[in-house]
Every structure is written in C-alpha cells, then in structure tokens.
C-alpha cells in the first residue's frame, strides 16, 4: 500500500500491547546494543485500507558500516518467530518493522527492502519509538517509504509520516485503568524472597565471604604481610584441586538451567496449590 492510497478514511491503528512489547525488548537488550528493532504484525482490511498493528517481536541484528548504514538480521530467528506467531494468531501478517531511536536510521532503506518482500499485502510500515523520553514523553511515529527522484536519474526513498491512532479495546481499557490506579498508589516495599530462593542467596553470600577471606590471605602472603603456613597452603591446594575445571560460560549455563528448573518447580507447585484450593471451594459450594 503506497502513501497515495492513504486517504482520509484510511487509518493505522496501533494496539498498546505493541508499545509495551517494544519497551520490554528495549529494557532487556544487551549492553552493547544501543537500539532494538523487530517485526510488526497486524491485520490489513482490504476494502477500507485500514491497518491494525496488533503484535510484534524483536529480531537479533548487527549494525556496521559508516554511520551504521548497513544491517545484518538473523533471518532464521525472524522466520522461526514468525512461524510461531502465525500458529497462535494465523490472521496476523507482517506489516512492517519497528525500531527505537530519535530519527529514522541510515539502515532503514535496507530494512524496507527486506520487509517489502515479507509484506504480501503491500508497502511495509516503519514504527519509530523515541525511548530518550524527551519532554517526558515516549514519542511514537509511523512512516511509509515513498519513491523519489526524476525519470532516468537517481532514485531513492523518503520516509513520510502517516496518521496513526492508538486503539483501545475493552480488555486494553480495563488493563490501562488498573495500571493507572497502581501508578497512583504509593510505592510498595519489595516482598521477601521465597524460602527456596533465600537458601540459594544465603549460600551464595557465604561462599563469597569465604572466597574473599581466602583471597585476602593469599594476597597477604604474596605481599609478605603474613608468614606462609604449609598446612593452610596444602588445605587450600586440596580444596581448589577438588573443584572441577569448568569454563565460565558453561558454568553460567549450568547454573541458569538449575535455576530455571527450580523456578519451574515453584511455579508448578503454586499452580497445584491454587488448583486444590479451587477444587475445595467448588466442592464446598456443591455440598452447600
């Protein structure tokens, strides 16, 4: 769909869920990634030309070149996420891409060419969200690329603004009102950790304190502030050699896997507890 096809009756409707998903992706980005981008999904009404942007997901990418004018996308990840999204919501199609930043990036032309092939319904849209909070607002804009140039000469693309409305359905209104009420409440103190997680935290702190003690002892020996003790040295050697040599990345993966298993067990136990409580209440209602 080109810009010329947009008339007064044509609208781009943006669901608030998309904004929250972009903010979540921006907050969870890696430290060396300044901005995030991803694929927009939505529904295109063929007769009215109305486009509803209902969903999105971030895409792994790498910027390079002068002024980051070139971009490499993880196409396999993008295709896998698109397949999963369409299994859950088959009516949603690719309608464009989103990115964070203050202005349209230099790589927007390459992204437009890629998403033009992905969009079977027409021209891809570009949603730009300014996360710098200038003026205490998160400015969000929608662009559409328009071909420019003269016949027989150099041609290019110009990204022009399109009118956009944020669409609130009944569930969205209920959720936004609840969030508004929660924001008006005074901040709450952080709740206590679950007993299982407290044990992990306490054990980690205990190990950290003992490691600090060992490091101070070794540094004092090396700096000749303390006389070496062969008995202590042999004991430390036996302790250190008893620990298997594991790469940092592998250890991190093993620890995170065990932590996920623990959290999954806690979640399942909580669900079973709630299920039993509901069953008990339903049984009492039937008996009454």
Curated annotation (Swiss-Prot):
GO terms for cellular component: eukaryotic 43S preinitiation complex; eukaryotic 48S preinitiation complex; eukaryotic translation initiation factor 3 complex, eIF3m. Pfam families: JAB (PF01398), MitMem_reg (PF13012). It is found in: Cytoplasm. Residues 12-149 form the MPN domain. Gene3D superfamilies: Cytidine Deaminase, domain 2 (3.40.140.10). GO terms for molecular function: metallopeptidase activity; translation initiation factor activity; translation initiation factor binding. InterPro entries: eIF3f, EIF3F/CSN6-like_C, JAMM/MPN+_dom, MPN. Component of the eukaryotic translation initiation factor 3 (eIF-3) complex, which is involved in protein synthesis of a specialized repertoire of mRNAs and, together with other initiation factors, stimulates binding of mRNA and methionyl-tRNAi to the 40S ribosome. The eIF-3 complex specifically targets and initiates translation of a subset of mRNAs involved in cell proliferation. Component of the eukaryotic translation initiation factor 3 (eIF-3) complex. The eIF-3 complex interacts with pix. Belongs to the eIF-3 subunit F family. This is Eukaryotic translation initiation factor 3 subunit F-2. It comes from Drosophila persimilis (Fruit fly).
């Amino acid at each position: 769909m080109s810009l010329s096809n947009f008339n007064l009756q044509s609208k781009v409707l943006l669901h608030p869920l998309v904004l929250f998903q972009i903010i979540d992706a921006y907050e969870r980005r890696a430290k060396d990634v300044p901005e995030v981008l991803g694929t927009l999904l939505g529904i295109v009404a063929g007769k009215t030309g109305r486009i509803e942007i209902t969903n999105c997901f971030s895409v792994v990418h790498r910027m390079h070149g002068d002024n980051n004018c070139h971009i490499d996308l993880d196409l396999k990840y993008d295709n896998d996420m698109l397949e999963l999204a369409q299994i859950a919501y088959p009516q949603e199609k690719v309608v464009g891409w989103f990115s964070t930043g203050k202005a349209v990036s230099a790589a927007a032309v390459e992204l437009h060419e890629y998403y033009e092939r992905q969009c079977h319904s027409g021209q891809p849209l570009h949603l730009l969200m300014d996360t710098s909070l200038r003026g205490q607002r998160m400015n969000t804009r929608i662009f559409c690329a328009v071909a420019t140039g003269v016949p027989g000469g150099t041609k290019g693309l110009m990204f022009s603004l399109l009118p956009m409305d944020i669409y609130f359905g009944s569930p969205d209104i209920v959720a936004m009102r609840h969030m508004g009420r929660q924001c008006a409440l005074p901040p709450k103190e952080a709740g206590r950790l679950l007993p299982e997680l407290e044990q992990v935290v306490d054990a980690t702190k205990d190990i950290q304190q003992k490691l600090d003690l060992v490091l101070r002892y070794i540094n004092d020996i090396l700096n000749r502030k303390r006389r070496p003790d062969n008995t202590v040295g042999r004991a430390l050697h036996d302790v250190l050699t008893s620990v298997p040599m594991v790469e940092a990345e592998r250890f991190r993966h093993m620890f995170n896997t065990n932590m996920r298993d623990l959290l999954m067990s806690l979640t399942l136990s909580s669900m079973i507890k709630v299920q039993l409580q509901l069953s008990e209440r339903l049984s009492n209602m039937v008996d009454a």
